[in-house]
Amino acid sequence: TRQPTKAATAINNKMLTIIQNINSGRLSVRMRKAAILACFDGKQKLSTVCHIMCGFRLKHRRIMDFFTAWFETPWLYAAYIALPACLLLCAKPALKAWRQNPQAFGILLCFFAVFWSLGAGLDGGQLGGLRYHLLGVALGSLMVGSAAAFWLAALFMLPHMLLTVGAQNLAAAPLNVLAVTLPALAVAELLRYAVRRFLPPNLFLYIFINGFFCAAAGMMATGAAITALLSQSTVFAAVDLWQQAFPVFFLISWGEAFLTGMFTAIFVALKPQFLLTFDDDFYLSRQNTIWPSES
């Protein structure tokens, strides 16, 4: 019998949890084959294992675009209940934001299309073939408010998933929306409240914290939520996602932060009416100065 290499020892140990379920009938024939394959070939890429387990390949697929086969039914059903509830709670403020500036909604949809098409990933290792994309959620929260940004992201997720994972995986769309958008929006709301509550009304603070820093922190929060969620999936049982997948979110958070901060500064200078959360009277009044000696 072929013995696994030292590099595959950790992977093989985690695959034992899958093997233990083989006799219980919880795994399909494909998953049984994948368990055996992973144990005797620890260098096998996760994309190949997933192809055997679930019938799809992970090449050029994004870890932030969910497949239905990644999750058990209770997770999907819970998302079917949670997403409509969240949308209902956000409906009134989202409608108010729409009435104030509908043009900003169209611009934000264009930003979503651009941000979500910009991706990065690793080509080697167990997670070779998986891709990550930017969000633009922090920018959306500044433009139309968190409630409206959540609605737009939920609507945009449908055509996005049709193009990336296909109609057969739309059942995972509600869970995808919750995992990708809610953490980043929660961070945006928290930081924006902290800036207005505890810091002086400074234009630099608005751009740097609400734009740059908030986008980076939101991406990290989304990455943590996705990693924690996918860690519960048997498809990724052979991989330590916290060590191999989560660090990538830290890298792409810089791109998210740079683009969000740049567009925030542009809007403040040229089109402040596109920023629902920006108030000229609050941030640009004469008594607000950068240096104490100017007052």
Map each language-model feature to its residues.
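Short, highly charged, low-complexity non-transmembrane loops/tails of multi-pass membrane proteins
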Residues: F267, K271-E294
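Hydrophobic transmembrane alpha-helices
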Residues: D65-G140
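Membrane-embedded alpha-helical hairpins and interfacial helices in multi-pass inner-membrane proteins
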Residues: M64-A69, R196-A269
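Ser/Thr-rich, low-complexity intrinsically disordered segments
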Residues: T1-T17, S24
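Short helix-perturbing small/polar motifs within transmembrane alpha-helices
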Residues: A85-C90, L162-G223
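Hydrophobic cores of alpha-helical transmembrane segments in multi-pass inner/ER membrane proteins
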Residues: Y80-L87, L142-V144, T181-R192, W254-A265
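Alpha-helical membrane segments and adjacent membrane-interface helices in multi-pass membrane proteins
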Residues: L118-A184
